[in-house]
A protein has these predicted regions:
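Hydrophobic ligand-binding cavity/cleft-lining segments
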Residues: 1-60, 166
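Hydrophobic/aromatic beta-strand elements that line small-molecule binding cavities or substrate pockets
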Residues: 19-21, 79-85, 103-110, 121
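Hydrophobic beta-strand positions in extracellular immunoglobulin-like domains
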Residues: 23, 69, 121-123
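A short, structured loop/turn motif at beta-sheet edges
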Residues: 27-28, 55-59, 84-89, 107-116
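Hydrophobic pocket/interface hotspot
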Residues: 30-34, 40, 65, 83, ...
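Glycine-rich portal/gate segments that line the openings of hydrophobic small-molecule binding cavities
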Residues: 51-100, 151-166
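Beta-strand/loop substructures that line and gate deep hydrophobic ligand-binding cavities in soluble
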Residues: 96-150
Length: 166
């Protein structure tokens, strides 16, 4: 009976997000800026904290980072991400554990002038209150995610535009 209940709760708490961003910057620049995780707080207001578990400057396979994110609504999520696979200028995937459990996948497609980034985020919340509130709070969780992504993309684009105007 408990297994059935857990399966039901898991299905109600599965979130699949698929976001596509078009960046007016060359693929190489977009890739390098996005992998420079230490600079994320400068352009991503929703990122409260990010720190490596180990010594590294740019993300590569096996790296482990901890982060805390807070959107518009009065809660934050903390999770660890471990880089699972990386193909330079093309693909990045990672697993997350903590307040969220799941995976993120980024595909990059670009040219000398622009970059398309497709970000897939498949996660389950692990916080009990989030799991129990899913039947009525799901739209708020989705909206919060969308607002965080919108702000992050806007901040990333502004940062790229500023660097390219210098």
């Amino acid at each position: 009976m408990i297994s059935f209940f857990n399966d039901y709760i898991d299905k109600k708490n599965y979130y699949n997000f698929n976001n596509c961003w078009n960046i007016d910057a060359p693929l190489e620049q977009s890739w390098n800026e996005l992998l420079n995780y230490k600079k994320w707080p400068a352009w991503c207001d929703a990122l409260e904290k990010i720190e490596p578990l180990g010594q590294f400057d740019h993300l590569k396979k096996g790296n482990h980072i901890q982060s805390i994110w807070k959107g518009t609504f009065p809660y934050s999520v903390s999770f660890d991400a471990i880089i699972k696979d990386i193909i330079p200028y093309s693909f990045l995937s990672f697993n997350v554990t903590g307040d969220l459990r799941g995976e993120g996948i980024c595909h990059f497609l670009g040219s000398n002038e622009s970059t398309m980034i497709n970000f897939i985020w498949n996660v389950f919340p692990t916080k009990l209150w989030m799991r129990m509130c899913s039947s009525f709070a799901r739209p708020l969780f989705i909206e919060n995610h969308d607002l965080i992504i919108e702000q992050a993309v806007t901040g990333f684009i502004r940062m790229i535009e500023h660097k390219n105007s210098l």
